[in-house]
């Protein structure tokens, strides 16, 4: 595979996104225009209310991940889910972290010591549930790198763990690398077209666009994916 060959020659710091590479200083960059296009979008605007929740997000993330908590990544996910609106509501999901009633009921029963009586409309409880669910999903669905692990976790958060596992199985059956998201598993699914687009866009937007924007604004945590313009 091109990705593995480049990894062997250039090392992991040069290879990360798109399954084909974002290479520093433009080395071989002309060969991978699609990768450059993914990272080239202007930084998204951060809602003015986001900094008001920063200490709460840092506290809740640290409860699960400790001092190295990926606060900027959690902030990026909240941004994608609800634009930081505690009363955000869609047809099937509610609150800042957009939990469906079924998932809210499940996670409250799964983690009663931390989420007993979980109210998805409460912003603190919503963020607490999000970080706990993210940790549960990423632990159960590891990938080749931290970037891949988080891509799998976010895909499962958005579309369900069952769909993620079917996608990985389909990728492996077609000879793709089932532990790599970008350029590999992301291309394999039996989901409806709209569901695939929504799910893949969700992962890409959080990891490649929103998380870097929150890092640039000073939110803490090491990036999951290396994004080189």
Where are these regions (language model features)?
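N-terminal secretory signal peptides that target proteins for export/translocation
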Residues: 1-12
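Non-catalytic cell-wall polysaccharide-engagement segments
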Residues: 2, 17, 35-51, 55, ...
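Peri-catalytic and regulatory segments of divalent metal-dependent proteins
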Residues: 52-65, 88, 96
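Generic signature of mature, soluble extracytoplasmic domains
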Residues: 64-71, 79, 136
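Alpha-helical scaffolds flanking conserved acidic
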Residues: 69-76, 94, 147-155
């Amino acid at each position: 595979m091109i990705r593995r060959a480049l990894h062997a020659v250039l090392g992991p710091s040069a290879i990360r996104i798109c399954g084909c590479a974002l290479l520093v200083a433009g080395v071989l960059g002309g060969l991978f225009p699609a990768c450059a296009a993914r990272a080239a979008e202007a930084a998204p605007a951060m809602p003015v209310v986001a900094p008001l929740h920063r200490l709460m997000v840092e506290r809740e993330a640290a409860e699960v991940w400790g001092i190295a908590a990926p606060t900027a990544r959690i902030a990026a996910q909240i941004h994608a889910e609800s634009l930081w609106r505690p009363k955000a509501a869609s047809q099937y999901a509610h609150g800042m972290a957009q939990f469906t009633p079924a998932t809210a009921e499940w996670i409250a029963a799964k983690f009663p010591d931390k989420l007993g009586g979980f109210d998805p409309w409460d912003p603190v409880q919503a963020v607490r549930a999000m970080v706990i669910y993210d940790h549960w999903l990423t632990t159960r669905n590891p990938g080749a790198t931290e970037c891949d692990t988080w891509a799998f976790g976010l895909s499962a958060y958005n579309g369900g763990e069952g769909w993620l596992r079917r996608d990985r199985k389909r990728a492996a059956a077609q000879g793709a690398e089932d532990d790599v998201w970008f350029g590999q598993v992301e291309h394999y699914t039996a989901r409806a077209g709209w569901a695939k687009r929504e799910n893949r866009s969700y992962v890409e937007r959080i990891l490649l666009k929103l998380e870097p924007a929150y890092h640039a604004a000073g939110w803490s945590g090491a990036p999951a994916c290396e994004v080189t313009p």
